[in-house]
């Protein structure tokens, strides 16, 4: 795909004026970094960062049977989500393979917003549309209806509070409420993908530039800086958060990924993948699959996705994500490994980096957890 064919967000000119390095991400021309990705990472951990996430896929589901449709289409119990709250869940194939991981916001009694990963938005839209047959509910593609800005980091509550009258103190994690930010109508959600406190702001695209400028101005004294997708990846890696295409795929069920807790068998009615996921749960209980673990380098060489994890001359797993960790000061990775080598502190584990078996320490995820 040539750069002329890439989709651009409402903030594209802003990113270019800031000197951003742009990259093709799931068909979108997105900012990878503005300067030093390490500085952007540290800003989010210690102060605040501002992200353009307008490539994410918003899908609205409305109607008298919206909850019933989502309970059938997704593996979670969406009917128990109260208005103003959100839930992390997944959509699976009939064979249990993960199509995507999602956040579902209940906006009103009979209105939900499903937020899919950019790379899977069309797949999720098609699946929900197909699964809506027979339900009194409408599935609407709202990807062009929203721009999405995220303010993440310990200073984000104070920065946002200076621009809104919304009750941020009462806004819990995984909750969202309509409000006005810098005069702009927004859905204000206390969600994020960095391991820090923060907010995601869904607004009309025509309001994105003004809101970005207002947030930049309000955050200047607190040290807020614009941040690209590169540091977003290292932030989520430190926080032990899975990325679709790395830790999650159609080849894995939620139980294979260690995320069986998102599957709610107790909910009323059937749901797509129930039979296969029941078998997957039984398999995982009797013969645990490979386990997702953290790996911390003893040296300086950085592992990458697809590198083999080894022990005793045998391949025992595969790296799914790897990068230098600005917080730990050493390379880190997430990897699926055999259960026998998954316990934190397991000795003799290494990563095959271009023929050299580099020693790595097995640790529990996440690598980083913020102090609340």
UniProtKB/Swiss-Prot annotation:
Its EC number is 2.1.2.10. The keyword Cell inner membrane does not apply. The keyword Transferase applies. Pfam families: GCV_T, GCV_T_C. GO terms for cellular component: cytosol; glycine cleavage complex. One of its GO terms (biological process) is glycine decarboxylation via glycine cleavage system. Keywords: Aminotransferase, Transferase. GO terms for molecular function: aminomethyltransferase activity; transaminase activity. It is an enzyme of class 2 (transferase). Gene3D superfamilies: Aminomethyltransferase beta-barrel domains, Aminomethyltransferase fragment, Probable tRNA modification gtpase trme, domain 1. The glycine cleavage system catalyzes the degradation of glycine. The glycine cleavage system is composed of four proteins: P, T, L and H. This is Aminomethyltransferase.
